[in-house]
Amino acid sequence: YESDPGTPIMKGGRVAVVGGGNVAMDAARTALRLGAEKVYIVYRRSLEELPARREEVEHAMEEGIEFKLLNNPIEILGYQNPDDRRDPKNGFVTGMKCIRMELGEPDEKGRRRPVPVPGSEFTLDVDTVVIAIGTSPNPLIKSTTKGLEVNRKGGIVVEEATGATSREGVYAGGDAVTGAATVISAMGAGKAAAAAIDEYIKGKEA
């Protein structure tokens, strides 16, 4: 661990985190710790539909994060100086346009589908937007690694006990295998894969 890794961190003053899962809660709370003056969580469903763990939501609320529920972003607004293409402010976020939602009929998973409310658009005054609406494995992994089997969601298929993939000598674990899960789960998969890799190398050297 390095206290100063040398990589600058852009700190937002007013931050919008889009999403309602554990990663969204982590991102919002981290933004506060980095010095943001205001942090919003923007989620298109209601509090009851938030997929994040209850304790994560409660901690975020206790820390002063404002929840913009039943709202959905439709456009990220940015600064553009028409007279100076080299203006260093060009491309910086100036706000996020949203629309209010209401819950309609249930979808195929039984969750009530959010429906836009016509004419309810508004602009949220933010200078930073963090998108935290889900995770999926990078499709480049499969296309650049011959012989690697993936499931229909793009997750790498492995032997559960060892992390061994369909390609000899290649091991995988964490979200690239299971989809969005916890750091603890990924660490466990990493330890199992490390032990299996050690045995694999020893077998090659014998």
Regions found by a protein language model. Give the residues of each.
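Cofactor-binding loop segments of dinucleotide-utilizing enzymes, especially the Rossmann-like FAD-
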Residues: G20, Y43-S46, D175
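A conserved FAD-binding loop/helix module that cradles the flavin
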Residues: A27, A176-K204
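Rossmann-like NAD(P)H-binding beta-loop-alpha module
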Residues: E2-A36
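A structured beta-alpha segment of the ubiquitous adenosine-cofactor-binding alpha/beta core
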Residues: P5-G6, L70-I74, Y79, D87-D127
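FAD-site-proximal beta/loop scaffold in flavoenzymes
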Residues: Y1-G12, P106-A180
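Rossmann-like dinucleotide-binding cores of NAD(P)H-dependent redox enzymes
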Residues: A28-E75
